[in-house]
Amino acid sequence: MPVFLRRLLQSISAVLSVLALAAGLPLAAQDDITTQDATSGYNGVFITGPSSNPLSFLNGAAARTTGNPAPYDFHDFAPFTYIDSKLPKWIDVQGEERFRYEGYDNSNLKLGVNDSYLLNRFRLQVDLRAASWFRVTAQVQDARSGLQNPPIGPPNTVRWDLKLAYAEVGDPEKHWFSLRVGRQLINYNNTIIANSEWRNQARSYDAAVLNLNAKREHLGIFAASPVVPQAYGVSPHQEGNNIYGAYGRIDDLVPHSNLEPFFLWRVQPAEVVEPARAKTTGHENEKAAGLRFKAQAFKSLDYSGEVIFEGGKVGPEAIRAAATQAGAAYQFLDAAAKPRVFAQYDFASGNSGPATNGVHSTFDTIEPTAHDRFGITDLFGWQNLEAVRAGTTIEPHRRLTFTIQGLDFWAPSALDSIYNTSGSSIAFNKTDHGHHVGAEVDSYSWYELNKHFNLGGGAGYFGAGEFLTNVTTSHSYTTYYFALNFKDNGKK
């Protein structure tokens, strides 16, 4: 039996035994279908723009906490739904098209490294349903850039790739049991494992996912390997780069709430041990355990909190890291333009002595979302970072929203690196020049034309603090974008 599947079966057996003994609860699934549209609003949220399923509903208009019942200003256009209606009942077709123009000045805080370009992404999906409890899904994706400075390739250009290819027994939305095997999306928790939809190619996993559902208890158990995008042909996954995990959800312990305990185990054959010190790599065996709580009160107040602890070993160093986040949002439903104010705090540990202490205490964000995790400039990842966010969203017209937000960033360790969303080092100080990384202000807007089309745009500016001004050639970064999105699920 392949090692990948053997470890999945071992994980399933161990987790089921522990949960059955410790909780005595019926087991159920946290399903990636029900969470792929966002995971942090209570019972999911409605995405109005192409933001990459942002960390939380606190991020403003890109994620509504409820679907908007207001009528649209434009008539619907759904060609795949029409085609689907003419096909046999056991065939479903879906289509997506996304255009985005984006640009930036001073990439990675390097003076004069500027670019602007067009992005296009097309997806075509076919579902074959042999029975109500069995289906086979395939999706092809063509992602390309235009007018971009070289080199041209991933993540913006990945031509005619196989985005999805899986078989599924059971329906996770209807049945207590389902098993999906093949190339698929996994998006249980945007903070640490997600499909990162904002990127032009996004992220897929070659995986086996077992989902178990009861009335209030849900459990997903999975073994997965992230796909490494290639410019041409079918992209492979990286052998040995595997994630195993169990992600649970218990509903309504407090009215209108979700409690989500989870455990992840990640192994990699070669991971950089201390990016702030050298590029030396070593084998990684990392375990992460966490708990997230999210809830809604009085229809107007949303709040959430999360804590994650990491242990294990990377190269010769022991892993001891942690992260947490908490936030709240309140919407004035009876006021003009329905203003919604939000605030959020994030912390991820860093390494106070990367050259000397022999312990890897920089938090590993594993496979997170890449957009609006910490503002729309997308400069930083959840590693050696302390961030405060506050902002407001207004809705001056039905299905039209405007958001403005500000963020302030600090480095818990002045001697560790500051990291980007992929976990690579942007800059680090050999001596302590201060902890303030900088501040950011963003503004963006989304408008839903009809059920299948939306458009939006935004701009963000970041100004560097003393942590960066001593080691970067630019002390500011600017980004901007305009996007048009079409998605027709074509469901009968």
Give short role names for the model-derived ranges:
Residues 32, 46, 64, 474-492:
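Outer-membrane beta-barrel "beta-signal"
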Residues 87, 114-118, 156-161, 200-202, ...:
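Short sequence motifs at beta-strands and strand-loop junctions characteristic
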Residues 95-103, 138-142, 181-183, 221-225, ...:
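Transmembrane beta-barrel strands of outer-membrane/channel proteins
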Residues 102-105, 143-148, 184-191, 222-229, ...:
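Flexible, solvent-exposed coil segments and beta strand-coil junctions
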Residues 102-120, 130-179, 186, 190-195, ...:
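Surface-exposed loop and membrane-interface regions of Gram-negative outer-membrane beta-barrel proteins
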Residues 133, 173-179, 195-356, 395, ...:
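Signature for the C-terminal beta-barrel architecture of outer-membrane proteins
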